[in-house]
UniProtKB/Swiss-Prot annotation:
Coiled coil residues, start to end: 158-187
Metal-binding recorded as keyword: no
Domain of life: Viruses
Bias-annotated ranges (Basic and acidic residues): 172-181
Keywords assigned by UniProt, alphabetized: Coiled coil
Signal peptide: none
Comp. bias (Low complexity): 182-193, 217-226
Pfam families recorded: DUF7197 (PF23827)
Protein name: Uncharacterized protein L507
Keyword Kinase: no
Disordered as annotated region, ranges: 172-197, 217-240
Annotated source species: Acanthamoeba polyphaga mimivirus (APMV)
InterPro entries: DUF7197
Amino acid sequence: MHNELNNHTITYSEDISNNISSKNNEKFTPKEIQILDKNKKFFSTDIKYVLTMLKIINGESDISIRVLDWFVANYSKKNNTYYNIKKNGKCDRFYVHNEYKNQLNGYSKQYFDPFCRKKKVAYKYTDKISKNVIQFESSIGQLNFFQWAIRNKIIRYVELHLKIIEEDMKETTKKNKEKKQNSQSQEISNSIEMEVSDDPDPNICLSSSINSICLSPVKKTSSASKSDSDKKNKRQQLSKSVYDHGIKKYDYPIQLDFD
């Protein structure tokens, strides 16, 4: 199979359609074919990779997609999470959030997402030993994310630290919810105060039990009290009109001639 990309010919040793096809018969772009081909080669090496992903996306694992997404996007950022992994016989530090951001910058959310969104694909996996066929639906972004997460021990790390990651997600979500509710309550309180009038109720004023009424003084506003944002938002005049300084009145004698 051949595809033209950046004026170079890319050759695929095996037609990707043997394992992956578009759910809605959409055509794959050259970039999508590259991503799918890479993921196909990875998942085809061991059935346990496919089963690990399927347990999570089907809700059969203790790890949920939401927790996995929280770990790479939030928890790892807040805690600067890293660990050592061996690549090419060499141990390197793997900084989770930095690597996650690198993947996002390289692929965008469309092609790197733990959730099954955007273009859907039907994937067929045949076990080389048992010859069992596994078929499931995913997306290009989801396949690419799980390939990265499994290859770089992300899922293994989350398994070992699942409880603390879940607690962090719940606590942070709770605080953000309370903060939002407090902000909304403050806005309502401010709007109520603005609606209160200083004018006396006429029905109350008719009561003989009232000896005196004190009204709060009317607040005076001036142009000097305008906020900086008001001044900044004022549109600048590009040219001046001759009437900017008012209309001047002049007295001139008028002479009318009649033929």
